[in-house]
Amino acid sequence: MVEPLLSGIVLGLIVVTLAGLFYAAYKQYKRPNELGG
């Protein structure tokens, strides 16, 4: 049974990606003019 492991990896990647996007958006919201962004 490889499906549970595969689905777990996919969910983990999705969570990490969303967390990274929210973190970047939060930093950009807190300091909008830093590093030309």
From Swiss-Prot:
It comes from the Bacteria. It is found in: Cellular thylakoid membrane. One of its GO terms (biological process) is cytochrome complex assembly. It is a single-pass membrane protein. InterPro entries: Cyt_6/f_cplx_su5 (IPR003683), Cyt_6/f_cplx_su5_sf (IPR036099). The chain crosses the membrane at residues 5-25. Component of the cytochrome b6-f complex, which mediates electron transfer between photosystem II (PSII) and photosystem I (PSI), cyclic electron flow around PSI, and state transitions. PetG is required for either the stability or assembly of the cytochrome b6-f complex. The 4 large subunits of the cytochrome b6-f complex are cytochrome b6, subunit IV (17 kDa polypeptide, PetD), cytochrome f and the Rieske protein, while the 4 small subunits are PetG, PetL, PetM and PetN. The complex functions as a dimer. Belongs to the PetG family. This is Cytochrome b6-f complex subunit 5. It comes from Nostoc sp. (strain PCC 7120 / SAG 25.82 / UTEX 2576).
